[in-house]
């Protein structure tokens, strides 16, 4: 059978003017045989235009497909063959021709289906069989090729750089695949070695947001934890080019560039992490140089005109993360000193820029706060007075340069810069305030008729009132001015700031009930106005933030706290504001919540010391009656009902430098207060509090981490850890809990950590291994000797659960230690709960390690009395544990069994074996059966 041509008719010349379908078909066949494929195609097309039967139509379409194959027009060949198959599904010629067309089009998976159908219709046709074998081989080769990373990379770049694929789903999928491929080390290396960085540079130059995002995210995979690739990437793209992407208007692109630069910083500072990456392909002589070039470009970006406000904020965020030392124990702060010398003035320029009216530098509502945080981090990273003095000198010189000889605009810029310093390194800010004429200018500008001048001056006055000394000065000189502004100004933005100034001065006494700056009731009036502005949706978020600032100060007063938590609308507005992009409000929100929950540190003063202070006429702070525990508990419940946990979870998720270590500490304090009562913990877990506490416990100040870890411990004790911390998150809880075992933590924190670890150790072997890896066992053993009975008991219970691990069993089995002796002795203590824990540990160990059974008689001469006491206990659990230990000892050695049977133990076991079908009865009976098996005792006549 021939399948390559349309047919084999008798050759005869074409008849001009022939009109019948049959005649035209035969003419087409003749032309096809003569190699005139165009003429044949025309004849078949003409025949189709006549009144052809469905069968004739199928043949004609099939023949047209053969012509298109010869003419190498494979798309049309596939179309014609498909039309023939629609007319006759069993047409093997049409199926074969379509398979040929599909093969040429590269659609091998579809071609093989048609060939398989041909073979099923004509199993003995060798042409079909051979074609199927050939195409099968092609498919295997294509699979091998397509599975190789090189092919993937080449294919994806072809799609991404193809101008005709603009905006297609194919292009989007290729960009996603490229990003995923770069996350694997092998994929990242292939992309890098296939000139991937140069190709990615072309994507960046195209300017399309989606392509730029794909390119930046792919570069993240290439540079992640790899120094040499990072340096090579910076060399190819240009450090300036990479940094400049931060300044684009697109927020998504700017954030992606920020992430890339963060990865580059980490790679340059840390190098390759062993175990995660292979050997580097190049040797880096001095990565510190590349690091400085990168930081230098970031500093230049801060003051570059045309950079977006979001880009400037991202640059500040990168500097905050990259420059200061991670730990003050690291002696090298040279990078900080270099940044102060090279870029302090540039940072101050951002801090002194005004958002409204816009100046030369575009800034956001968060820019000044980010600059303040960076300045604070740099100042805290200094080691000696000489370094701090240099910092002060540079700041003062910069402020003087604007304050002197620059007119009113210069004075405004200088005062704004002072405000930035007061929010960050306040020591530098206070010194700047003492410069000649600065404070006087602040007071004078408060009375200005220009709104922007008043805003700058009033904000500076508010920040200056932070210190008690400064507050006293302002109370004497500026209160009347602030009151006039509050009462007379027509601008809400001025009034609300003046109100915050009054709030701050009114709270200068803190929680001390006896120290009030204003008359009785004044703070309540101020708080009421703050709540009113907070709830006003017509006012912009930036202005409403100041209302929260005011409440953060006023909530030191317990009367204000009580009214605030009763105001559901104000709480709702507060929580909504914390979720907005106005991130600078986070610290004020957290401060207000700390005050409402009384979660700051408070130690009850010694009554004798109080009397002594009164006798010496020293001031003694007094607690407000409404700050007593009953009032605090009521406020906590109202906050929980208002949805405080959900708001705090959103705050913790914030990726912003505004979420400082101090802010995280405040949130940790509030969480700890929220979980104090057992009945409230379910609400906290249900609203996501458990997962929010983990990052708080792993990062922040030491106090904040400890508070968050303690809150985690409380949740782990009273709720199912697998439900509270689902999936892999449960393993992240272990480290914070172990940190509470350190000696610098309180006894309560030690106790709660031990109880929480006990629960975790009872869940799975993987969790026990995690506890062992965190080196918790030596600390737990130490607490087993603690004098406090509850801590000693909790440590013993924890060790009992850990004893299920092979490594812990090895510790007990090792020679030359008293671990086993301690458990035996604790099994004889009067504390029933301690007895139960120790006996449980003994039962576990003797079951898992029979060799320990022979050592029990050696650790103490009172071992037999202790075991007998366990079996004679009125507590079923103690009896059962004791019976299991005895059974393990009997089964371990005939010699030990003989010693036990020669004592009163046999009588005790005999009595217990006659009980009901309880676990104790079964264990006692098993002991006696084993003794009978050894021939140590004889069964009685009843066979018992």
From Swiss-Prot:
Modified residues (N6-acetyllysine): 70, 483
Known tissue expression: Detected in peripheral blood leukocytes, bone marrow, adrenal gland, trachea, spinal cord, thyroid, lymph node and stomach.
Disorder this protein is connected to according to its UniProt record: Osteootohepatoenteric syndrome: An autosomal recessive disorder characterized by cholestasis, congenital diarrhea, impaired hearing, and bone fragility. Some patients also display mild developmental delay and intellectual disability.
GO cellular component annotations of the record: cytoplasm; cytosol; Golgi apparatus; nuclear speck; perinuclear region of cytoplasm
Region named Disordered: 1-21
TPR repeat placement: 21-54, 58-91, 92-125
Assigned keywords, A-Z: Acetylation, Chaperone, Cytoplasm, Deafness, Developmental protein, Differentiation, Myogenesis, Nucleus, Phosphoprotein, Repeat, TPR repeat
Pfam families assigned to the protein according to its UniProt record, in alphabetical order: TPR_16 (PF13432), TPR_8 (PF13181), UNC45-central (PF11701)
Sites of Phosphothreonine modification: 15
Outcome of mutating residue 40 to D: Abolishes interaction with HSP90AB1. No effect on interaction with PGR
Effect of residue 343 to V: In OOHE; uncertain significance
Record Gene3D superfamilies: Leucine-rich Repeat Variant, Tetratricopeptide repeat domain
Localization annotation: Cytoplasm; Cytoplasm, Perinuclear region; Nucleus
Organism phylogeny: Eukaryota, Metazoa, Chordata, Craniata, Vertebrata
Protein name: Protein unc-45 homolog A
Role: Acts as a co-chaperone for HSP90. Prevents the stimulation of HSP90AB1 ATPase activity by AHSA1. Positive factor in promoting PGR function in the cell. May be necessary for proper folding of myosin (Potential). Necessary for normal cell proliferation. Necessary for normal myotube formation and myosin accumulation during muscle cell development. May play a role in erythropoiesis in stroma cells in the spleen.
GO molecular function: cadherin binding; Hsp90 protein binding
Entries under SUPFAM superfamilies matching the protein: ARM repeat, TPR-like
Domain of life (superkingdom): Eukaryota
Major localization listed first in the record, in broad terms: cytoplasm
PANTHER family: FI21225P1, PROTEIN UNC-45 HOMOLOG A
Subunit structure and binding partners: Interacts with PGR isoforms A and B as well as with NR3C1 in the absence of ligand, and with HSP90AB1. Binding to HSP90AB1 involves 2 UNC45A monomers per HSP90AB1 dimer.
